[in-house]
Amino acid sequence: MVKRHVLVALTVGWVTGLCCLSSIAATDNHPNIVIIVADDLGWADVSFHGDQIKTPNLKRLVDEGAELSRFYVCPVCSPTRAGLMTGRYPIRYGLMRAVVPPWRKGGLDPAEVTLPEVLAKAGYHHRGIFGKWHLGHSHVKYHPLRRG
């Protein structure tokens, strides 16, 4: 009996949340921004750059959106992610060689302005980053929830 009440309560909460989100989305005039970063995906690994493996959904995203084809990346994820988040070269903030593991002290300097912070100032109230962080774990000031 208790499981049923919990299930009903969770369902009501979930539906209420969806209704609230849809009403918020209907009043938001900002265009959606979706950035996809894929590890180990080469330029020619997608069908719209000539590969034989079909990637129709990625092609549709490029056709209906924008493809950024001039960029700088590092061979490991932390410097690349930090560059994307700040718009700066990794050597400028000292994250240029390796992944920032959870036990390493330090991370992306909290004084660095990040993309989510810029979006917040531009009126984007609903922002999300999904996937790995790897820009500092040892102290709360480096956590992603503190970064806009």
Predicted regions and their residues:
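Formylglycine-dependent sulfatase
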Residues: 3, 9-10, 14-148
